Design a protein with these regions (language model features):
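FIC/Doc superfamily catalytic core
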Residues: 1-438
Length: 438
């Protein structure tokens, strides 16, 4: 019979092989320090509101709960004093609840970890759900809490069974004692984030909402490490790796060695921080551009340019043609050409390319580049394998480098993106090669 981690000798003290995580911790440190440097400037409340909203929406989506993003954003912006004009208005109690939890996490970012803090987060999250679950209170029912996977053939598999409800107060007391001390170095922050999450999920102290509260604790741990009230959108990246996230956390629930889990989760945090710094720099570049040119825009031009910014950096760096302007502004071709010529005279757009079609780009729009964290020795070993074993497959790479599949996949993806290696052949039988320079 499978023994879950809380049933094993040594619980609740899980272990993590720090030496085996050298590459992951090094990459985390680069991203963490880059983020800390970016945050030395006054916080842009638009970025803060966007991060809180993204985290609220994605942490809900991971659990299969869809919330209205505009309701979340409106609630958060109102609390932060940020201007926001929602496209419509709907009532969504779950959206309001998760928004209030995010605001509570931001407010209590450096508060001591206590049972009261946890039940407070849960109370905000589940407000209005009193008929369904115990809100703001740990579970007390005698029935076991189980995570069950149902298969296509109708059979069911118990993936996890949490400690009995009667054990929860004792488990939470031990949890709070273990994690009350703040992490002081980037490596300690990474490891605390990686360890606190499966520990909390293994206790599963609430009837519902454990995943959302658990991910909020990761955001709180990062805020403590950064020493500022900032809730980072951890769940936006977890959502991209949702299947692997559930698989890895399920493995952690059956063992007290959480090295493989940490090897998966720390790069997720690294990816999130890198994306967040990019978002901060994009907002600054957008603000700088609009401050320089917006006063000369017509209302129509303003709407089109802002629409380009809605698609992020990729949208802002896209090209404008008369045909595209016609679609976006819903005007005739002569009007579109006239609008573009006016913006060109203003200096807001410049001609790009040398093709037959006349195309423009936003003038001087640049986003400060990011120092992408690398995996150091791991990158070198994977590159060497692709060179000495042309067509090498992922499974062989994993066995040679001795890292988790998630870590190897992420490193390979970065090498492919950088143009150093490429995949050839089918998904099942193809392999990786050093990319030829043409």
């Amino acid at each position: 019979m499978t023994m879950f981690n809380w049933q094993q000798k040594g619980w609740p003290r899980a272990t993590c092989n720090r030496a085996a995580l050298r590459d992951e911790l090094a990459a985390f440190k680069v991203a963490f320090m880059e983020l800390k440097k970016a945050l030395k400037k006054p916080q842009d409340m638009e970025v803060v509101a966007r991060a809180l909203t993204d985290e609220a929406v994605k942490t809900s989506a991971i659990e299969g709960v869809n919330v209205d993003e505009s309701v979340v954003m409106s609630s958060i912006c109102k609390a932060l004093g940020v201007e926001y004009a929602p496209k419509g208005f709907t009532k969504d109690a779950r959206a309001e609840g998760v928004a209030q939890m995010m605001l509570a996490v931001r407010e209590k970012w450096n508060a001591p970890l206590t049972a009261k803090l946890l039940t407070g987060f849960h109370g905000a999250l589940m407000a209005g759900e009193e008929k369904r679950v115990a809100v703001g209170a740990f579970r007390t029912h005698k029935e076991p809490i189980r995570v069950i996977r149902r298969h296509a053939d109708g059979t069911a598999e118990i993936r996890y069974e949490a400690p009995p409800s009667e054990n929860v107060p004792k488990e939470i007391a031990a949890f709070a004692r273990m994690w009350k001390a703040p992490a002081t170095t980037p490596a300690d922050v990474a490891l605390k984030c990686a360890m606190i999450h499966p520990h909390f999920e293994s206790i599963h102290p609430f009837e519902d909402g454990n995943g959302r509260v658990g991910r909020a604790l990761v955001a709180k741990t990062l805020a403590e490490g950064l020493d500022m009230p900032l809730v980072l959108p951890v769940s936006t990246v977890i959502a991209r790796h949702r299947a692997a996230y559930y698989e890895e956390i399920n493995e952690a629930s059956r063992s007290l060695d959480w090295t493989n889990w940490a090897a998966f989760f720390i790069p997720v945090l690294t990816e999130m921080m890198t994306s967040f710094v990019a978002a901060m720099r994009f907002v600054k570049a957008k603000r700088d551009y609009l401050a320089k040119y917006e006063s000369g825009f017509s209302e129509r031009a303003r709407k089109v340019v802002l629409r380009m910014f809605e698609d992020g950096e990729e949208g802002a760096k896209g090209v404008l043609s008369a045909a595209k302007w016609m679609r976006m502004a819903k005007v005739s071709k002569p009007t579109a050409i006239g609008d573009l010529q006016t913006l060109e005279k203003l200096g807001a757009i410049v001609r790009v390319g040398d093709g037959i079609r006349l195309e423009y780009g936003l003038s001087g729009f640049t986003v400060e580049p990011i120092n992408e964290p690398l995996n150091g020795e791991l990158d070198e070993r994977l590159l060497k394998l692709a060179k000495t074993h042309p067509g090498v497959q992922l499974s062989y790479m994993k066995s040679v480098v001795g890292k988790s599949l998630a870590t190897v996949k992420r490193a390979i993806a970065a090498l492919v993106k950088s143009g150093l290696i490429e995949h050839r052949g089918s998904k099942k039988t193809g392999g990786y090669y050093v990319k030829e320079v043409r």
